[in-house]
A protein has these predicted regions:
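Beta-strand/loop-alpha-helix module characteristic of Rossmann-like adenine-cofactor folds
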Residues: 5, 114-157
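Short phosphate-binding loop-to-helix
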Residues: 55-70, 89
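Glycine-rich, flexible N-terminal cofactor/catalytic loop recognition
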Residues: 1-55
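Short active-site oxyanion
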Residues: 23-29, 102-104, 153-154
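Short glycine-cluster motifs
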Residues: 71-130
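Conserved helicase motor
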Residues: 51-60, 132-137
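Loop/turn-to-beta-strand initiation segments
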Residues: 1-2, 72-76, 152-153
């Protein structure tokens, strides 16, 4: 079983009881940065083994994690903050699990763009999450111009 576990954004207390329980009971926690995740795990006295799973090892580590999942191991996927699979390499292992009929359970929690949307005070019945803006000035300016012409609320990082 693959558990997609949302983790706190900034405040370690912003985690669900269910997330703590899952992190304590799985066989392995796959995290973007084991050093960062260790802070959360230490705070809650969680001693589950961890392994790194990040942008540059997602293909090889993804195959390794898939092998463990097919052997019946339970793995929790966490990102450094927020919900795995949103603008991080988590989508890759989730996709592998879906393609290989691995059972997936989502443990909800913080997602930065939802917080931004709600706190904006803008209408939320129709919105676009545009992800990260381009780094280059001209591309960023062009993207902002395009987004400003939309008729609904836009959230981006």
């Amino acid at each position: 079983m693959l558990y997609i576990v949302a983790t706190p954004i900034g405040n370690l207390k912003d985690i669900t009881l269910r997330a703590v329980e899952v992190l304590r009971t799985v066989d392995l926690i796959a995290c973007e940065d084991t050093r960062h995740t260790k802070i959360l795990l230490d705070h809650y006295g969680i001693t589950t083994p961890t392994t790194s799973y990040f942008q540059h090892n997602r293909f090889t580590k993804g195959e390794y994690l898939l092998k463990l999942l097919t052997q019946g191991k339970s793995i929790a996927l966490v990102s450094d903050a927020g919900t795995p699979g949103i603008l991080d390499p988590g989508y890759h292992i989730i996709n592998l699990a879906v393609k290989n009929n691995i059972e997936i359970t989502f443990i909800p929690g913080p997602t930065a763009f939802v917080n931004a949307l709600v706190l904006s005070g803008k209408p939320s019945h129709e919105f676009l999450f545009a992800g990260f803006l381009p780094n280059r000035k001209l591309a960023r300016r062009n993207q902002l111009k395009r987004l400003s012409e939309l008729k609904y609320t836009v959230v981006f990082y």
